[in-house]
């Protein structure tokens, strides 16, 4: 039986590679369209910046891995074989769904896809288990982590609203500041605008994302939380001075720096969040296999 599960794990690993390829094709436009659209750098430079963001962002993804492990359903309510079937069904469905949307040229959220695939697969497995045991489907909620599932779904819906409102407000303010008399306004407040943008990127990227980093120690996170305001003020003042020097003496367009930094941060956030959508389920299956193997070894020792 163990060889059967090893074959399933190998197949899940292959599907993970395919899913990663298909998923990145779907999500790449999210963090590349701004930089490539305005042509502030060459295609190769933009790809290098985005690639670096993905590589570094992968180290911040451990906090999202729990969604695949136990965020949608209660794994203790299922047997190991049922867990493997659930994960297998999720990965196959994800590849087919994303590839179909890519072929049709339709955008889709990989997070929404994986969440509802896990939810649907777990619900189907739980319903089959209840019916096979002659129990009522009313007990289905005991198998599903309803509070966490509702929290994830509501978070996705809220993020759409927040993104729309914040994007509209920031775009309006930016157009109001720089659309008229661009050269004069750029020399006066370009450094302040750039410093605010870079500071905000660092805050959300590093300081808020540090909790999910695999290499961060508890004392480092505590120090960041205790000194958030001084760090942000120092960064804002420092970048304001630096950008003003770049504008006044070197005639450097700091907007190019901001756009590349934004591209890096979006790729970074993609790796820390959406990358789990492609590899989280196979890793959860591997962890389940290790737990099952350890339990089998203990049972043999007791015998």
Region spans (language model):
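Membrane-helix interface motif
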Residues: 62-67, 122-136, 204-217, 275-290
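Short, non-helical or kinked segments that cap or interrupt transmembrane helices
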Residues: 24-32, 40, 104-119, 272-283
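Core mid-bundle transmembrane helix pairs that form the ion/substrate translocation pathway
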Residues: 152-250, 257-261
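Transmembrane alpha-helical segments of multi-pass membrane transport proteins and ion-pumping complexes
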Residues: 17-24, 28, 54-67, 90, ...
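Small-residue-rich segments of transmembrane alpha-helices in multi-pass membrane proteins
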Residues: 116-125, 191-202, 261-271
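Membrane-interface alpha-helices at helix entry/exit sites of multi-pass transporters
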Residues: 40-51, 295-297
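Conserved small/polar residues in nucleotide/adenosyl-binding loops
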Residues: 301-303
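Membrane-interface helix termini and inter-helical loops of multi-pass transporters
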Residues: 69-76, 134-149, 210-223
């Amino acid at each position: 039986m163990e060889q059967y599960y090893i074959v399933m794990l190998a197949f899940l690993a292959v599907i993970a590679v395919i899913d990663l390829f298909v998923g990145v094709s779907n999500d790449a436009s999210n963090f590349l369209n701004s930089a490539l659209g305005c042509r502030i750098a060459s295609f190769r430079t933009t790809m290098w910046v985005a690639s670096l963001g993905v590589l570094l962002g992968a180290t911040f993804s451990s906090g999202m891995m729990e969604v695949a492990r136990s965020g949608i359903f209660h794994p203790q309510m299922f047997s190991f074989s049922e867990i493997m079937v659930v994960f297998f069904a999720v990965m196959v469905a994800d590849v087919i769904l994303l590839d179909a949307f890519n072929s049709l040229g339709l955008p889709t959220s990989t997070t929404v896809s994986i969440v509802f695939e896990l939810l649907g697969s777990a619900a189907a497995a739980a319903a089959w288990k209840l019916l096979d045991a002659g129990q009522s489907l009313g007990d289905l909620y005991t198998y599903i982590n309803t509070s966490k599932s509702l929290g994830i779904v509501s978070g996705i819906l809220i993020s759409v609203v927040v993104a729309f409102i914040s994007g509209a407000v920031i775009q309006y303010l930016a157009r109001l500041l720089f659309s008229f008399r661009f050269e004069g306004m750029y020399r006066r407040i370009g450094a302040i605008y750039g410093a605010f943008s870079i500071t905000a990127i660092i805050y959300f990227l590093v300081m808020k994302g540090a909790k999910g980093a695999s290499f961060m120690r508890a004392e480092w996170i505590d120090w960041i939380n205790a000194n958030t305001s001084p760090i942000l003020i120092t960064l804002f003042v420092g970048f304001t001075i630096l950008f003003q020097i770049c504008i006044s003496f070197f005639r450097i367009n700091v907007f190019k720096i901001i756009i590349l930094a934004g591209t890096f941060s979006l790729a970074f956030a993609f790796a820390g969040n959406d990358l789990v959508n492609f590899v989280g389920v196979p890793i959860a299956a591997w962890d389940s296999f290790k737990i099952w193997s350890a339990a089998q070894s203990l049972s043999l020792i007791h015998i």
